[in-house]
Amino acid sequence: MSMRSEYCGLVTEELLGQSVSLCGWVSRRRDHGGVIFIDLRDREGLVQVVCDPDRAEMFKAAEGVRNEFCLQIKGVVRARPEGTTNAALKSGKIEVLCHELIVLNPSITPPFQLDDDNLSETTRLTHRVLDLRRPQMQHNLRLRYRVAIEVRKYLDAQGFIDIETPMLTKSTPEGARDYLVPSRTNPGQFFALPQSPQLFKQLLMVANFDRYYQIVKCFRDEDLRADRQPEFTQIDCETSFLSEQEIRDLFEAMIRHVFKETIGVTLDEKFPVMLYSEAMRRFGSDKPDLRVKLEFTDLTDAVRDVDFKVFSTPANTKDGRVAAIRVPKGGELSRGDIDSYTEFVRIYGAKGLAWIKVNEVAKGRDGLQSPIVKNLHDEAVKAIIERTGAQDGDIIFFAADRAKVVNDSLGALRLKIGHSEFGKANGLVESGWKPLWVIDFPMFEYDEEDNRYVAAHHPFTSPKDEHLEYLETDPARCLAKAYDMVLNGWEIGGGSVRIHREEVQSKVFRALKINAEEAQAKFGFLLDALQYGAPPHGGIAFGLDRIVTMMAGADSIRDVIAFPKTQRAQCLLTQAPSEVDERQLRELHIRLRQPEPKA
């Protein structure tokens, strides 16, 4: 006979009067007047088990049961007495009268209660196996599974083929640092773990597989930010003979399908499309959160000749910018609030935060309250009020600096105010889901330290057709056929049309100061393949971890990954990374150099 006939959480009134065999863990044990109640838990939920003292041997076993004991229960399903049902449980109308109780494995006392919502992340990750038993973690990982299923369903229906690409590959040090794997059989040589399957999926297009996908692990040895992992999972896709618009339409439909089928959310029938330049101008970010209703107003040209040097200096600097955000009803904010926001923007490099409270627009400058108004001439004041659309009771915040500092600091302030209690109370943020595409990214960014251009996306992204000439004459003007899908302020997917002609790829390498010899050494296999009739192709990669985090409403991507790393790229459960013994190092022809002692 099978050890289990039903899952605990699926025992309902349909099984009334039937004998069942259940397996699971003790969530709670209660002794009520000589009758023992056990909440037995498995992955499907809870069921209440009643242990009556009439069965002496079974009852004695039940008396010794404690939380997290692993049990097998045999008994009969019966209705709960009137007034004791639990509407929160699928099994809440029934209970199981226990006839036989077998302790499959006892448990030592857990280091925490599974229903404790105030556990530190260190505790949770150190005892991850127990943490994963908690209902929320069970829910999150099953949601992740369902997302993966729906992705596969959609892509299979669209003719995509799941093809695995190598985990041990060639190091191509462009972008983030690679994780290196020493080769024992080739002393002094190393594999790299892939940052993405980028080049292999392009080669698959050249090889006539037409449509490829893979749900794949990727690795980046980068300085970890708040919500990054050294290993992460991509929904990686590539397709041939489609235009940029067709690629976006195809994968927009995939995301709509996944959201509808997994969490019942209907996303916009057509996602809005925004140029990168517009996103930076209006929101200071290439991943704008469209739920927040605040926008930038550019004032650079209006304050070039004011006496206020904080404004006029960046306004007359090549890469300077002066911008503002108007906060409706922001006049209610206290000086303490303003000081707090001032300290907040300093995190992003701003030197301070100028502001004007608009008490009465009709009175002109006399209706404004601010320490900076006296340093602004009438034309500048008029431009500020008119361009921002300021009304009585508003406040206007300003940032003036290099464009990057303005965008970063004012963009962060926009989100902070929008999502604050003040913002919610005053309708500055909407609920729900706000997807969009951001397109036409710069092809290159200039690296001041290395004194050269670097690829803004990656060096295999195609320039826009009309910008091909700029590759050799003015790379800064060159825009790429690149696109990001943004949802509620997070980039959830990014891709591009790829370069499919060898001569164009070589021009891009030259623009990046990668000479022909270096290009052949690093990417010769790609350049060779492009000469064999490579088709036009493009693709996209979605961050599975990020998508599931948003769907689950989780605080961190670590809450949707079974065994994540910490911000220091450590696994607290297994204590990885760890030292290895000298013999292993000798086999790999590696000698460790001890770090220099600190002075």
Curated annotation (Swiss-Prot):
Keyword Cytoplasm: yes
GO biological process: aspartyl-tRNA aminoacylation
KW Transcription regulation (keyword) present: no
Function: Aspartyl-tRNA synthetase with relaxed tRNA specificity since it is able to aspartylate not only its cognate tRNA(Asp) but also tRNA(Asn). Reaction proceeds in two steps: L-aspartate is first activated by ATP to form Asp-AMP and then transferred to the acceptor end of tRNA(Asp/Asn).
Localization, UniProt: Cytoplasm
Signal sequence residues: none
Organism encoding this protein: Paraburkholderia xenovorans (strain LB400)
Enzyme Commission number(s) from the entry: 6.1.1.23
Subunit structure: Homodimer.
Gene Ontology MF, one: aspartate-tRNA(Asn) ligase activity
Name of the protein described by the UniProt record: Aspartate--tRNA(Asp/Asn) ligase
Gene: aspS
Gene Ontology terms: cellular component: cytoplasm
Catalytic activity: tRNA(Asx) + L-aspartate + ATP = L-aspartyl-tRNA(Asx) + AMP + diphosphate
UniProt-annotated stretches for the region Aspartate: 198-201
Alphabetical keyword list: Aminoacyl-tRNA synthetase, ATP-binding, Cytoplasm, Ligase, Nucleotide-binding, Protein biosynthesis
